[in-house]
């Protein structure tokens, strides 16, 4: 069994904190919340301090922040129905089009595409068209309810979205006409899918839900060794593992570490849990074990968790309790 060691507890935001995002270099992070502000934090000696407060971009709660792969830009998704793009501490673009709250934003691996999703049930894909210019490339209406999260595949231009309609959708650009299409629907959860994350090579996806389960999905490509049928020669995603009975309330976020393969979950029962793939895990029927559980990680709902992309075993979390915590996993 491992354990999570609390390294830092940080305060600064007023009200609940919705999102945290490590910078690609792993030496700083951004946070956002109810106070309509984004804070950029970095390490000075052994202390994390707020270096910048970005407070003039949004009129309502900021739900999520995400750095571009190059680390030069930050995107923020807000309940004011806009997405802001920040560079060098200034808002350089505002993306408008959603009718309601924007819940999530994600950059593609190349940094050339941005995805957003909203309570208006739509997913938008934006092309970076030049300096501070973004053009809408697609509006995707595949979900029947509020869309909670969008995440790009780590190596391909494939987008995943999670929704209040209990499903996950996959999207890709058609080779024929350059239109974006929904290529797969992943159905197994019995309630809202709050968050999703790909593993390092993008062949698997983890999802977390209001149904208090984590699910692992695997991609089966045309001609796969397992003999899984792939209609129309399109990739099929199958649920290959369900982790149930370990969370007592809704699971709001999940992070699949690209360095270690460990999965962290953020739960409405105030806990953070870490899962490790079993040594005897099978490709088409994987098994995961609970490595450690930090039962009272926060005093209220844990809204987000994210593994540091560079510093192995470092985890960040934020909560309704108004704090950000930085943890180190000891295995």
Swiss-Prot record:
SUPFAM superfamilies membership: WD40 repeat-like
In terms of InterPro entries, this protein maps to:
CIAO1/Cia1 (IPR028608), G-protein_beta_WD-40_rep (IPR020472), WD40/YVTN_repeat-like_dom_sf (IPR015943), WD40_repeat_CS (IPR019775), WD40_repeat_dom_sf (IPR036322), WD40_rpt (IPR001680)
Q: Which spans of this chain does UniProt mark as WD repeats? A: 12-51, 57-96, 97-136, 142-181, 188-227, 246-285, 297-331
Q: Some GO term, biological process aspect, for this entry: which one? A: iron-sulfur cluster assembly
GO CC terms of this entry: cytosolic [4Fe-4S] assembly targeting complex; metallochaperone complex
Query: What keywords are annotated for this sequence in UniProt?
Result: Repeat, WD repeat
Q: Where are the transmembrane segments?
A: none
Under the heading PANTHER family, the entry gives: CYTOSOLIC IRON-SULFUR PROTEIN ASSEMBLY PROTEIN CIAO1-RELATED (PTHR19920:SF0), WD40 PROTEIN CIAO1 (PTHR19920)
Write out the function statement from the record.
Essential component of the cytosolic iron-sulfur (Fe/S) protein assembly machinery. Required for the maturation of extramitochondrial Fe/S proteins.
Give the record's family classification: Belongs to the WD repeat CIA1 family.
Q: What is this protein called?
A: Probable cytosolic iron-sulfur protein assembly protein Ciao1
Q: Which source organism?
A: Drosophila mojavensis
Q: What is the lineage of its organism?
A: Eukaryota, Metazoa, Ecdysozoa, Arthropoda, Hexapoda
């Amino acid at each position: 069994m491992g354990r999570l060691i609390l390294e830092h507890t940080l305060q600064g935001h007023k009200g609940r904190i919705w999102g945290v995002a490590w910078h690609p270099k792993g030496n700083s992070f951004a946070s956002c919340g109810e106070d309509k502000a984004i804070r950029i934090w970095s390490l000075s000696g052994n202390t994390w301090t707020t270096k910048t407060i970005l407070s003039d971009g949004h009129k309502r709660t900021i739900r999520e922040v995400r750095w571009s792969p190059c680390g030069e830009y930050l995107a923020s998704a807000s309940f004011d129905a806009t997405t802001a793009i920040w560079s060098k501490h200034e808002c350089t673009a505002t993306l408008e089009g959603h009718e309601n709250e924007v819940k999530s934003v994600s950059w593609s691996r190349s940094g050339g595409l941005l995805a957003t999703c909203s309570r208006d049930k739509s997913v938008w894909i934006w092309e970076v068209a030049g300096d501070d210019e973004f053009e809408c490339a697609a509006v995707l209406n595949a979900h029947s309810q509020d869309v909670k999260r969008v995440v790009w595949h780590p190596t391909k231009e494939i987008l995943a979205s999670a929704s209040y309609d209990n499903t996950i959708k996959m999207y890709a650009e058609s080779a024929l006409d350059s239109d974006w299409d929904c290529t797969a629907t992943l159905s197994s959860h019995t309630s809202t899918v709050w968050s999703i994350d790909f593993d390092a090579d993008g062949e698997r996806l983890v999802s977390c839900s209001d149904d208090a389960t984590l699910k692992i999905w695997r991609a089966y490509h045309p001609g796969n060794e397992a003999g899984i049928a792939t209609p129309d020669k399109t990739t099929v995603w199958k649920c290959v593992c369900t982790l149930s009975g370990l969370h007592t309330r809704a699971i709001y976020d999940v992070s699949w570490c690209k360095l270690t393969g460990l999965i962290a979950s953020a739960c409405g029962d105030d806990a953070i849990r870490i899962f490790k793939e079993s040594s005897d895990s099978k490709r088409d029927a994987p098994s995961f074990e609970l490595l450690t559980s930090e039962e009272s990680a926060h005093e209220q709902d844990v809204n987000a968790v994210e593994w540091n992309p560079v510093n192995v075993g470092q985890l960040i979390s934020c909560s309704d309790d108004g704090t950000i915590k930085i943890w180190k996993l000891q295995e």
